[in-house]
A protein has these predicted regions:
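Alpha-helical, largely C-terminal catalytic domains
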Residues: 1-458
């Protein structure tokens, strides 16, 4: 990921001056892009439950787009939570996903800071339908409102505001902080809680540390598969925009193996099946089954590099994707309004933000490093790059170390993994050196080129 120096600057706590208006010419395209002939979209038949068929009546979107949103909500719900016993909660989750889809590509249609009415829903009412009687309904409500707030700002004119700038600056603080924020952005712990609720497992819960680990596992796998999708979107919240992209394949392999180890460890706990099922589908098969992804359009492949046609389609919300282009101008008049909005969000952080986020935004919203590259407004400047903070050379190693330590960290959070690790059947085709996954990954990647689309097989 590279930055245009005319568009970004190092905004750090040590700088007392802040640019409020900035105009530049469009950056020069330096990477050759293969332009493909525009292809027509194949015909789709959309299916969704009657329960939600009229949920978007009166919303300012074309009927064809509404149909696609409703179908997408069904496909996601049925894929990541294939089994349910509580139908009312299941329908409530479909409505959660409908709101979430719109937040991700048409954020101007909603703003959670303006009250309980979101689209045609009572947000608190839907959340109550989903989590009443579960261990932490208030915590899950905060989790989802954080998602709506950040996703809605990212895909709207509010993206250049004070809140989103401070939010993205914090993503680059550390791997641990990033994964907690990515957890909310991907609704990972939230959907694990939903899976338990929809199966009526109201007495099953995880510690915060366990939720952190499960979310990191799911998000790492999802982001590894979605690498090129996220680049085509100019995404700010993508794991391998910060962690070394040359570890993408090895990280997926490592997480997949730990997920299967969890399946073995929980063999006598049927209530955990919905948790591992979510992580398994979220981490890969989702991209094959949902029409929101390009598996069919790309000849039944995953991991194909984006081109200018895909970026243009993303900019036009094809498949409900959203392109985050770098802003060429920051509106000085809007700055004071956005500053007040940010202050209001922080003041109501105990209901709008997950615990700890308001403090992070206040304490380190200007960034934590004097040499990482921060921006007054975030987005991708050209094709083949992400839209967030660019890490400096001294900050990069901690991300590599964090990724490579995943297997050991997993066993500390879930000690039941240790005996599973010990009794694992060794692949007889594996190298005779019998290196651990981490050792093999380190050996394979120590001198690997840091190209944005390279991968390491171990």
């Amino acid at each position: 990921m590279s930055r245009c120096p005319d568009l970004c600057r190092r905004d750090n706590p040590s700088h007392s001056h802040h640019t409020t208006t900035m105009t530049t010419v469009a950056p020069t395209q330096t990477i050759p892009v293969k332009v493909l002939k525009k292809s027509s979209r194949p015909k789709d038949n959309w299916y969704y439950w009657e329960d939600v068929a009229h949920d978007l009546d009166g919303i300012s979107l074309p009927k064809s787009v509404k149909d696609e949103i409703l179908a997408c909500s069904l496909e996601y719900t049925r894929t990541v939570i294939p089994h349910w016993t509580n139908r009312a909660r299941y329908v409530a989750f479909m409505r959660i996903i409908i709101m979430g889809i719109i937040a991700e590509f048409k954020g101007d249609l909603l703003d959670v800071t303006k009250g309980d009415n979101v689209l045609n829903y009572s947000l608190d009412g839907v959340l109550s339908d989903l989590f009443t009687g579960t261990p932490d309904p208030a915590g899950m409500a905060r989790e989802y409102k954080t998602f709506l707030l950040c996703s809605g700002d990212k895909s709207s004119g509010r993206r250049s505001g004070e809140f989103f700038r401070r939010y993205v600056n914090n993503l680059a603080h550390s791997p641990r902080r990033y994964f907690r924020m990515r957890d909310s952005d991907a609704l990972c712990r939230f959907t694990i809680a939903v899976a338990l609720a929809c199966g009526d497992h109201d007495d099953v819960w995880f510690t915060n540390e366990q939720f952190d680990f499960l979310a990191e596992l799911g998000d790492t796998m999802y982001d590894a598969v979605s690498f090129f999708k996220h680049r085509s979107e100019g995404e700010t919240n993508s794991t391998f925009a910060y962690a070394p992209s040359d570890l993408r394949v090895a990280a997926f392999k490592q997480c997949r193996e730990v997920l299967w180890a969890l399946n073995a460890a929980w063999n006598d706990r049927p209530e955990m099946a919905c948790v591992t099922s979510f992580l398994r589908y979220f981490g890969g098969p989702l991209h094959m089954m949902m029409r929101r992804y390009r598996y069919v359009e790309e000849d039944m492949t995953m991991g194909r590099e984006e081109d200018s046609e895909i970026v243009d389609q993303t900019r036009n919300n094809y498949k409900l994707w959203n392109r985050i282009d770098a802003s060429k101008q920051r509106d000085q008049d809007a700055d004071s309004v956005e500053k007040k909005r940010y202050e209001n969000i922080v003041a109501h952080g105990d209901s709008l933000l997950f615990p700890g986020l308001a403090r992070w935004l206040e304490d380190e919203g200007e960034g934590h490093c004097d040499t990482c590259l921060y921006c007054p407004s975030y987005g991708a400047e050209t094709t083949h790059c992400f839209g967030g903070v660019e890490l400096c050379e001294s900050c990069r190693p901690q991300w590599r170390d964090h990724v490579l330590s995943f297997r050991e960290r997993a066993a500390k959070v879930f000690p039941e993994l240790r005996p599973v690790y010990k009794r694992a059947a060794e692949d007889i085709i594996a190298p005779a050196s019998k290196r651990t996954c981490v050792e093999a990954t380190k050996a394979a990647t120590e001198n690997a080129p840091a190209s944005p689309d390279s991968g390491v097989c171990v």
